[in-house]
């Protein structure tokens, strides 16, 4: 059965997601969000993806903790700079860069395999 109107109203909105990211606690990385990421975030919301799952992964990264193996974090070879990718769900990915020198986490993009590649 599809999502009821009540269930849909409990979903985290894009605005709530951005506020939650801004107010994450116990983080060591400063989070920067690209415009591309924001546009892709809107698309993820329209696809009814659970933004809380994405927030939880980003919080783990911002704390400097390792992601669980189910997220399959790895670097991508196709970029000039080091870009990381992980799976939020099997066909929902997060792309980011991080610098340990300045402790900055840059959220580059999110979407499906076909969106990103």
Please name every model-derived segment.
Residues 81-83:
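Conserved N-terminal boundary motif of the eukaryotic protein kinase catalytic domain
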Residues 40-47:
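Surface-exposed, Lys/Arg-rich phosphate-binding patches that contact polyanionic backbones
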Residues 1-30, 36-39, 51-52, 56, ...:
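Enriched for short, Lys/Arg-rich terminal
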């Amino acid at each position: 059965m599809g999502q009821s109107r009540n269930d849909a109203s409990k979903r985290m909105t894009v605005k709530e997601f951005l506020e939650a990211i801004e107010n994450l606690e116990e983080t060591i990385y400063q989070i920067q969000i690209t415009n591309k990421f924001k546009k892709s975030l809107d698309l993820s919301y329209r696809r009814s993806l659970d933004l809380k799952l994405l927030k939880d992964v980003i919080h783990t990264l911002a704390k400097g903790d390792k992601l669980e193996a189910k997220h399959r974090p790895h670097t991508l070879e196709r970029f000039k700079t080091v870009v990381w990718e992980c799976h939020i769900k099997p066909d929902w990915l997060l792309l980011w860069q991080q610098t340990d020198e300045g402790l900055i986490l840059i959220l580059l993009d999110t979407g499906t395999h076909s969106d990103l590649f």
